[in-house]
Amino acid sequence: MGAALALLGDLVATVSEAAAATGFSVAEIAAGEAAATIEVEIASLATVEGITSTSEAIAAIGLTPETYAVITGAPGAVAGFAALVQTVTGGSAIAQLGYRFFADWDHKVSTVGLFQQPAMALQLFNPEDYYDILFPGVNAFVNNIHYLDPRHWGPSLFSTISQAFWNLVRDDLPALTSQEIQRRTQKLFVESLARFLEETTWAIVNSPANLYNYISDYYSRLSPVRPSMVRQVAQREGTYISFGHSYTQSIDDADSIQEVTQRLDLKTPNVQSGEFIERSIAPGGANQRSAPQWMLPLLLGLYGTVTPALEAYEDGPNKKKRRKEGPRASSKTSYKRRSRSSRS
């Protein structure tokens, strides 16, 4: 076994020197790929340049006879070493492993199909949202972090922020400015109107009531006879008829408005108007805003903060009309028997 290991060491050293001299890898030399490549080059030289001697072709390629011998004899040496080891130890598995060590130096063969289904894929299939299912939100984080280049995060960050700021100034700022101006104008108008209503002086005016009373009294005194006929009768009898007022004397010969006012006698005196409402100040000296109770719904309506309790106070509770229910007809049949007379 020691001799086999010594031969293995010499073989590895020789193949390594040949690989360093030619540029081929150890795996290519052991597998025979390097020898096949050299044979193709020698054949091409013989075809193109007419070189028939192998030594001249090897010299033209730039190889020495020793190196050429090592490259062409390496696959056989590996096979012979495997046979020697198998003969000495009786372990064919070790020879197979040694052959694979040189033959498959850079190429790995998957053994999945040897133990599972032969037509199985060599790579597991994962859906696009596989990692997002395992870690929710990781895809969104990865997609967003690509906007900042880790290698040049400074210029990328500056470019991204400046572009976002420019988009805001160009697209969103005019709309936001107009909305803000509209909102502030509306708020200023409502605030000014509310302050005006709070600080102004209010007075009780009964002119509409006096006018309504005058019109009501006028129409209540009208005669069912047409006014033209009433005037004709009054002129014939020498009396004065007033539609809505009673005169103590004629006002046709009055000299001034004061005299007309003195002669005019109204049965329903006017209600005095012009009484000012005293404005109350908030107690405590904090100069808080205050308003009378009858003005509170108006102010709250301007600010848009009318509460349901205030609506119920102003409009009254919403009373639902109960449905009038008549006597329900009994679904059960009366099984009471009539009282029979004892007479036959």
UniProtKB/Swiss-Prot annotation:
The chain crosses the membrane at residues 290-310. GO terms for molecular function: channel activity; DNA binding; structural molecule activity. A motif (Nuclear localization signal) lies at residues 316-324. InterPro entries: Polyoma_coat_VP2. Residues 334-344 have a biased composition (Basic residues). GO terms for cellular component: host cell; host cell endoplasmic reticulum membrane; host cell nucleus; membrane; viral capsid. Residues 273-308 are annotated as: D1. Residues 313-344 are annotated as: DNA-binding. Keywords: Capsid protein, DNA-binding, Host endoplasmic reticulum, Host membrane, Host nucleus, Host-virus interaction, Ion channel, Ion transport, Late protein, Lipoprotein, Membrane, Myristate, Transmembrane, Transmembrane helix, Transport, Viral attachment to host cell, Viral ion channel, Viral penetration into host cytoplasm, Viral penetration into host nucleus, Viral penetration via permeabilization of host membrane, Viral release from host cell, Virion, Virus entry into host cell. The keyword Acyltransferase does not apply. It comes from the Viruses. A lipid is attached at residue 2 (N-myristoyl glycine). One of its GO terms (biological process) is virion attachment to host cell. Residues 312-344 are annotated as: Disordered. Belongs to the polyomaviruses capsid protein VP2 family. This is Minor capsid protein VP2. It comes from JC polyomavirus.
